[in-house]
Amino acid sequence: MQIFIRTKKALYTTGVGERIIAHAKKVVEEERLVKDYIQTNEGEIEGKISIGVSSLIGYTILPDILAKYLNDFPSVNVKIDVGSTKDIIANQGDYHLSIVRGSRILNKENELLYSDKHYLVTPKDVDFEDLAVIEFQADPDYITHIKNYFEERFNTKYEPQIFVDQITTCRELLRKKVGITVLPELVLEGLDLDNYHIEEVMAGDKPLTRDTYISYDKSVLMLPQVESFINLIKQDSLSNEQ
């Protein structure tokens, strides 16, 4: 394959040679553009981050965290999956980090973010006996604590009449005075508490609490966009403790 043809008087480029030269110029130009971009954006955090979040956190805490994160790092593309903790753990390999409640993820770094208490919430202007008990989907141990509290507190069998798969649905049913339910402290925000009886739920002689963890592999800390998100949500956690 000839790229050049040399004669006694000149050097000529063949058709193949012209294509090779054009390609080489294009590569050199693209390399220059990349170098210029790197110099211009040196120190800027960008890239992609994928996050799996339990539904309760996705509904309550995440929107404010995400708004601040994107304000600080507008060049980052964020992908969020919201679902039950069980689903998030099952699909943990799809995410740079996961935020789950109640359970740590095996073989991951697990840092405690929040530990919230729980309260029995009852509308004030409706007779207790006329209200259905609403139960949201949760792990068996957690439901057992609620059952034991209810039966000890009211000396009656715990018999939920309404079962929902999202705790936020419990809150909305409560707003409509459909029934009574137990809600985490996080979900009480936004309710007009003057309209409800609020009673702390106990597990034996201690308050019933639910822990929220952020879980990730140490290796993802090498990605600035991921490390920045983790630092931001940890700062929020610390501010809530104060």
Tell what function each PLM region has.
Residues 1-13:
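A short LG(V/I)-centered, amphipathic sequence patch enriched
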Residues 20-42:
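Alpha-helical linker/hinge and terminal dimerization helices associated
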Residues 46-105:
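Central regulatory/effector-binding core of bacterial HTH transcription factors
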Residues 52, 118-144:
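Short loop->beta-strand "edge-of-pocket" segments that line small-molecule binding or catalytic clefts
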Residues 84, 155-201:
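Hydrophobic hinge/microswitch elements
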Residues 109-119, 185, 194-211, 218:
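Short beta-strand->loop
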Residues 132-156, 222-223:
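Secondary-structure junction motif
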Residues 200-242:
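A late-sequence structural motif
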